[in-house]
Amino acid sequence: MNVYIDKQNLVSYVHSMKDSRFEDCNSMLKKCCDINFTFTKYDLDQLDQEDDRFSKEALVQIKLWMSTMMQGCKGKVRWGINFPPRPLKTNMHNNFSHEDLSAVYLLDDEKVITVKNMGSIIVDGPGGELSALSQLIINDDNLYTKMFNPRELESWDILDAYISPATDIIIVDRFLALDESLYESNLYALVEKLAIKSKCKLNYIIFSDDKDRASRVAIAPDWDNIRSKIKRKVKNITGYDPNVTFILKYKVEHDRTVFTNYKLFHSGDTCNYFNSKGELITKGRYLNIDSIASKDCRKSCSSFIEDMQAVINDVIRINSDLIKGDKKSCFLKFEQPVQL
């Protein structure tokens, strides 16, 4: 996972060593991240001469931290990385790669707070480094994964502490739309909950089904109505109409998965956890939440995107009418693949 750090942010980060969050964040940087400094080593050496706010003692502290980080650092450390482009733009994520969309940005830019408040990517300015990094630490015991027993859940509110900024929310659950009476308590409640950190135009891509494969009964959900309701409910949270796309009758994915830029959710049962009265009905035994900071999670996310892209390509080839909606995503493409 890439972390981009401006010079002023490095100074601020090292200065926060006494914060209780620092140890875990520092461990994550050392063990899980590729660190990309947007300035050169020479720039760092000149810090105390260029800016009278910084003493030689502060520079010594930074270099001591740097020396400690280099010992056993598992990721790459790069200097003079000219990314992201400056000045920052609120729509800069539109041109990001998949890796860029799941990176952390610690930047000294006049628009950094504006971009942060949009909730599309994890970004913060000087003084906000630990707040940004700690969003990827989700458990005191095992820093990057959390397991719940769904049978003990009271509501979807349990997810509040684990929602991160996002551009895309990809939901895979073939049973999610089979029972209209469960939409409010599950489908709609879930898409709303996943949007709580965002004030931007989100992309929802939902892989589901319009047939109960066990009984082989077609139920014909009103996809246009479902899409309209999702748009309305999410707009009430984010202020923007989301893009909503459904992909139907997929064959290769049985797991119930929710993918976002920084978190991966796995459910052992369909996400229809509650009945129309909000009472728990799931028979699932686990709901796992994994942070992109974990190398294993990053591999799973990469495989997931590849698999879902293959599903889309197959549906386009066989019957493109089974893809309904806006067909917009930062992670998935909806064009006919080029045959070589």
Q: Predicted regions span which residues?
A:
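A structural/positional concept
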Residues: L133-L187
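PLD/PLD-like phosphodiesterase catalytic module centered on the HKD motif
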Residues: M1-F148, Y188-L340
